[in-house]
Amino acid sequence: MRNYTQQYINGEWIDSDSNETIEVINPATEEVIGKVAKGNSNDVEKAVEAANNVYLEFRHSSVKERKELLDKIVEEYKNRKQDIIEAITDELGAPLTLSENVHYQMGLNHFEEASRALDSFEFEERRGDALVTKEAIGVSGLVTPWNFPTNQTSLKLAAAFAAGSPVVLKPSEETPFAAVILAEIFDKVGVPKGVFNLVNGDGEGVGNPLSEHPKVRMMSFTGSGRTGSKIMEKASKDFKKVSLELGGKSPYIVLDDVDVKEAAKATTGKVVNNTGQVCTAGTRILIPESKKEDFLTALKEEFSKVKVGDPREEGTQVGPIISKKQFDTVQSYIDKGIEEGAELFYGGPGKPEGLNTGYFARPTIFINVDNDMTIAQEEIFGPVASVITYNNLDEAIKIANDTKYGLAGYVIGKDKETLQKVARSIEAGRIEINEAGNQPDLPFGGYKQSGIGREWGDYGIEEFLEVKSIAGYFS
């Protein structure tokens, strides 16, 4: 049982102003596995004051000092590898291999990349007799989601530290343990007091007062569009800078020259990875009408190989949905797909056979889907695919872009020129050709209702900076 009833503020673990706590549930067992403090506005006030008090000192720290700090974090992060893996498997229900190879590793990648970025990042530039300088924006509020407990926190923290901006972090109350471990790491390596502050709690008690606090100059949020809109509204009252990474309904375009077995394997991975709880999940699979029969046969075969089950059992690829509430949401979308006339091709409502305990969902494929159906337009956040056919490339691109979202897109095929054309045509912030994979120095963020701003690498650092021009500096 993990019980974290204190907040980390100004370099110390202190009692929360509130005596209330939030229970953390293991979604694979439905058991309470710990609790965290349910913070309030007084906790936020203390954290913001601590960050504000150190702001000028941290802003004026040297690049060398900040790089050394990031390098120390990297080494201690590695020392806590097993703790991080165990925490994520317990709180998120991610299979152990996924916790290690994706969750743990992505967090590490962001701290390493922020350090590398500082080697060449230009904080100052001369233009004639003028100086253009980039300065840390100031106290930054970070609000992170439950689906990637280390990735989303690490990428924001690494960028803020590299920029010289102190932070107040509010992690998701559903997966808070990984953030506590990060706080322990920062404490161990000597992150200066006030530079990092952790306030656990819910959106109403912590997220809202953080977004509205007049001394917070930047809000960085990852999560739902609904919550992002609220944060933006609250932050706008005193014109805070806002960076938002929101939802997606990403298209995966399968070209007509593709190997269908290869394409089926690739698209399956993009649907079921992290139990479909991925903002970039490629759940709208667009296939040529001429390849439909062969592709669907291969897709069903790939889905049938996916092992759903105990995240601690060897060979498990897909764990549970995060909560009963989210499980019910996924089920309601499956029901909606059937109701609107999509054909259930694989999976369906309910839990996989033999998995009565835990919030396990059946990986599901809908075919004969129209792009205007609810399941093709709304983010489900579960392992549910919508297969849509197209007759020509222009139609495929039109369907791909017929969405309010624009976070990611995928294309698989053989002809390089066609692949590049499709990649350039999809209206989204991140496109992947032939399963190219993640690259931590590439910018990440969305078009349209998928967000504002960019994260990862030097682009992420830019979000935590203000730009100042000084005319006559060199005259």
Curated annotation (Swiss-Prot):
Question: Transmembrane segments in this chain: where?
Answer: none
Q: Which reaction does it catalyse?
A: an aldehyde + NAD(+) + H2O = a carboxylate + NADH + 2 H(+)
Looking at its record, which EC class is this enzyme? oxidoreductase
Where is NAD(+) annotated to bind?
201-207
Keywords (alphabetical) are: NAD, Oxidoreductase
The family classification in the record reads:
Belongs to the aldehyde dehydrogenase family.
Q: Per its UniProt record, what InterPro entries does this chain match?
A: Ald_DH/histidinol_DH, Ald_DH_C, Ald_DH_CS_CYS, Ald_DH_CS_GLU, Ald_DH_N, Aldehyde_DH_dom
Identification of the protein by name:
Putative aldehyde dehydrogenase SH0913
Residues in the active site? 245, 279
Indicate whether NAD appears among the record's keywords: yes
Q: What is its EC number?
A: 1.2.1.3
PROSITE patterns, alphabetized: ALDEHYDE_DEHYDR_CYS, ALDEHYDE_DEHYDR_GLU
**One MF term in GO for this entry?**
aldehyde dehydrogenase (NAD+) activity
Q: Which organism is it from?
A: Staphylococcus haemolyticus (strain JCSC1435)
